[in-house]
Amino acid sequence: DDYLIEKYPNDPNRRVKSARIDSGDLARGSKRLRKALDAVGKPYIKLVASNGLDEKKIANMELYEHAHFDSYGVGENLITSASDPVFGGVYKLVAVKQPDGSYTPKMKCSDSASKAIIPGKKMPWRLYDENGQAQCDLIAMDDEVIEAGKPVTMVNLDSDAIERTVTITPTKVKKLLVPHVLNGQLAIELPSIAEKKAYIAKQLTEETWESELRLECPHKHYVNMTPAVAECRSKMY
């Protein structure tokens, strides 16, 4: 205690605002340090944890070990994407543009219906309920128009789903496909860091269900297709 009083004086000009624990048993260390700091009248000192942290380690310390940290410093696992170091995106041909400007749907055949791509030029939409919460995403043909306030029939992408078809009436709809590069040129104004943060925050609060954010067994985001898309896929498969 005498060491803490000397190390962290109450002089406002020299007051330490936080203490970082970076090694050893982090949760246990936070409890011991919090108890010691409180005992010498320094509850204002915040505790920060770091050292190879990720969302699972943080959840374990908070939920099961009852750590006394005020904030967590995540670096390595935030920028390296340790669980998914490689983006496995693959471009597949879905349509060929004809001289008259129309598109002919194309499809890569597969032995598995679940792996067969969805043919045709398409436009994804997001549908919202009366509270402004996103209900699901909908894959439509590019020339289809999805309107707010009008019933929309959707077909489940999962062929084994109990309810294959459902109809809802969204109060708001939004196109999700926004061109960023056209003819090799940037087509949008790049957002600032603050705008990016605000966009992500809105995605997590209004565009995503809480059940989709669970660390364990998260709920899958609903993605359906219009009957026109389902029919095109069925005819070509």
List where the protein language model places each region:
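Glycine- and Gly-Pro-enriched alpha-helical subdomains that act as flexible
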Residues: 1-32, 36-41, 47
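Gly/Ser/Thr/Ala-enriched C-terminal appendages of enzymes
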Residues: 24-27, 33-45, 53-237
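Short hydrophobic "strand-cap" motifs at the C-terminus of beta-strands
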Residues: 50
